[in-house]
Design a protein with these regions (language model features):
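N-terminal leader/targeting and accessory segments in enzymes
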Residues: 1-77, 308-309, 324, 338, ...
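Residue-level signal for inorganic ion chemistry
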Residues: 9, 38, 53, 74, ...
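Acidic, Mg2+-coordinating active-site environments of NTP-dependent enzymes
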Residues: 12, 16, 162-285, 311-312, ...
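Mobile, glycine- and charge-enriched loop segments
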Residues: 33-40, 130-139, 305-325
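Active-site beta-alpha connecting loops in nucleotide-dependent enzymes
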Residues: 45-46, 271-273, 282, 290-363, ...
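Short acidic-hydrophobic, aromatic-tinged amphipathic segments that line or gate anion-handling sites
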Residues: 62-65, 367-376
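Phosphate-binding loop of NTP-binding sites
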Residues: 67-198, 207-211, 405-412
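Short amphipathic alpha-helix with an adjacent loop that forms part of the alpha/beta core around
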Residues: 377-383
Length: 412
């Protein structure tokens, strides 16, 4: 981290600041991760662990009066001292995967910091900025959208030079009302770019600014799968999922905007629960995509299931898709029809909204319903047979990773 003096933090009047250190060289919210010189920011129950943080070597502890404002001030202070080029990534789907791909592309040729997991909100973005070192050249941020103004607020802290909108689809409709609302909210990233910045956006995305370079993404970029890898833009990637090609194209556009060279071959380490593949008994396969779901990503996952399964029986364990507003029942029924269309032979629907999958999935040979993830575990364990190809996917709140973990344990 670019060091900050404790006295400077004190002058920001962010809350109750304690400690004997003169300089902080890191920021943590988990006392177990404290290293000497860190600032421990107590959030929620973290207030109980201040003494533990000091004992582990923290330079100071902060109990913020207004947590979001405190994190914003810390992130802004570090960002203002950094000469790194910042890339902000948002979109209805693919944000984290695009971030992971871009990080793998940049790392060989530039000192790069990128968001851990899905550190994409008012706490996660500043925490990522607080990892910038004096010699950091590129910072890759993921920007969440849970309503109007959030992306603009995050951009005010991060000041991205390059903005990537991966795609726009029906997500967070409870918060923004319509697809037009999603466009408006995502457009805050483009509006926040500096003159001379680069906006990388879907083909039909409206951009009114004339003082930024606009790169438009094709919905189906040219890609070729061979020998278990995918070739996009002259770069060989270690994945075969069809939807990742679009994420790779977006990442390559950002790489070009940064002026960095394209490597010939890249092995991406994707964040957990985003299409992780685990062998199952009898030549079966588990596709753990349980981190999140919406209609766009759910269809993409079903396409991947169909392409990957081959002659194996296709099993889908699908949970609720959250924040779809009044159209939620219709969206779930539409996905149910996609389940049937892509040849799924056994479907387990998890959650109240997931009943809609069953309504749309006429023709699927075997269907089951469970109230929650815990109740789904025994149903899935009974249903899955050796040699099956199993997709597990739902919105984050469903917690469907417990099903994936139960299946993976069988193969351990």
């Amino acid at each position: 981290m670019i060091p900050l003096r404790v006295a400077e933090i004190s002058q920001l009047s962010l809350g109750e600041l304690e400690g004997r250190g003169e300089e902080i060289t890191g920021v943590q919210v988990d006392s177990r991760r404290i290293e000497p010189g860190d600032l421990f920011v107590s959030v929620g129950r973290g207030v109980d662990f201040g003494e533990d943080a000091l004992a582990r070597g923290a330079a100071a502890t902060l109990v913020p009066t207004r947590p979001f404002e405190a994190f914003a001030a810390l992130g802004r202070a570090v960002r203002n001292r950094s000469e790194a080029r910042v890339v902000g990534i948002t979109g209805s789907t693919g944000k984290t995967s695009t971030k992971d791909i871009l990080a793998a592309l940049c790392a060989p040729s530039a000192r790069t910091v990128w968001a851990e997991a899905s550190y994409n909100n008012e706490i996660g973005v500043p925490l990522t900025l607080c990892r910038l070192e004096p010699d950091t050249e590129v910072c890759i941020l993921e920007l969440a959208m849970r309503g109007f103004g959030q992306i603009a607020d995050l951009c005010a802290i991060a000041r991205p030079d390059v903005g990537v909108v991966t795609n726009v689809g029906p997500v967070h409709l409870e918060l923004v009302g319509s697809l037009e609302g999603v466009l408006r909210a995502k457009g805050e990233l483009v509006a926040s770019l500096p003159a001379g910045g680069t906006a990388i956006v879907p083909e039909e995305f409206p951009v009114e600014r004339e003082d930024v370079e606009v790169v438009r993404l094709l919905p189906e970029p040219e890609a070729r799968v061979e020998d278990g890898r995918t070739l996009v833009g002259g770069v060989s990637f270690n994945f075969t999922a069809h939807h990742q090609a679009a994420n790779a194209a977006a990442a390559l556009a950002a790489l070009d905007a940064l002026g960095l060279p394209r490597p010939e071959r890249v092995d991406v380490e994707f964040s957990r629960w985003r299409g992780e593949e685990t062998p199952l008994p009898g030549g079966g396969l588990l596709i753990n995509d349980a981190y999140n779901a919406n209609p766009v990503s759910m269809k993409a996952a079903l396409v991947h299931l169909a392409a990957t399964a081959g002659s194996r029986r296709r099993v889908a364990v699908l949970g609720d898709m959250a924040e779809l507003g009044s159209g939620a029942p219709s969206f779930h029924e539409q996905i149910g029809r996609e389940v049937a269309r892509y040849g799924v032979e056994a479907l387990v629907a998890v959650g109240e909204l997931a009943r809609g999958y069953l309504a749309g999935a006429s023709g699927v040979a075997t269907t089951r319903w469970a109230a929650d993830a815990e109740a789904a575990v025994p149903l899935v364990e009974e249903l899955v047979e050796p040699g099956d190809c199993v997709l597990v996917k739902a919105s984050r709140a469903v917690g469907l990773e417990v099903v994936a973990e139960a299946l993976a344990a069988v193969s351990a």
